[in-house]
Regions:
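Pore-lining and gate-forming transmembrane alpha-helices of multi-pass membrane transport proteins
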Residues: 1, 130-161
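Predominantly long cytosolic amphipathic alpha-helical stalk/bundle segments
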Residues: 21-108, 112-126, 156-207
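Hydrophobic alpha-helical transmembrane segments
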Residues: 1-16
């Protein structure tokens, strides 16, 4: 019963925490790319982004090292991603342990019940067959209870792991898009001054 309550609490907590809108807020990636293009990457924007969601934390990590070589930025993204996965995996190890240990504990209870029943037979004889069958049934209830707890726990454990893996892929895509946007903005900024200088020289020549 205790394992069942614990498993239910973990499942409900993870369902609430791993909601898509909480991990990957809609439109956040595009909004941050617009910041990058417009040069609105001040410390307050980045700090609020970092605290907003796991996706925001990943994009903020990329912005912390903007202007550095792409390999360094990607390394920072991967490092931050590992920390975020660890945070999203919170309590899942416990849920997986419950899924694995539930049937074993149920089987243990069944074995103990069977041993007690056979020891009773040794002391008092077989007695009533119906009573013997009832004792066996009560012992098997332990195994059934363990499986009732383990099967949903295993299903939800796999579900959460799959959801987290999907989130990680999407966050990496958003981070890559941000890198591309920053590099495009950098290239555009580098291309503008020569053009401006050429226009100035042309205007001076006309004068």
């Amino acid at each position: 019963v205790l394992l069942g309550v614990l498993a239910l609490a973990i499942i409900l907590e993870r369902l609430w925490t791993l909601r898509r809108n909480e991990v990957l807020p809609p439109g956040l990636g595009q909004e941050v790319r617009n910041w990058a293009v417009r040069g609105r990457l001040d410390a307050s924007h980045i700090q609020s982004l970092r605290a907003s969601s796991p996706l925001g934390a990943l994009l903020a990590a990329a912005l912390d090292v903007r202007g550095k070589p792409r390999d360094l930025v990607r390394e920072r993204i991967e490092d931050t991603g590992r920390h975020l996965v660890h945070r999203m995996d919170r309590h899942l190890n416990a849920l997986g342990t419950i899924a694995s240990a539930g049937p074993l504990l149920g089987l243990f209870g069944t074995v103990v019940g069977m041993i007690q029943m056979f020891l009773g037979i040794l002391d008092h004889g077989v007695g009533d067959v119906n009573q013997l069958a009832g004792g066996i049934g009560k012992a098997l209830v332990c195994t059934a209870a363990g499986m009732v707890i383990a099967v949903p726990s295993l299903i939800m454990y796999r579900y959460f792991r799959g959801r987290i893996a999907g989130y990680v892929v999407e966050m990496e895509q958003e981070a890559t898009a941000l890198l591309d946007a920053m590099e495009s903005g950098k290239a555009g900024a580098a291309a503008r001054p020569p053009s401006a200088a050429a226009d100035a020289r042309l205007a001076k020549g006309r004068a």
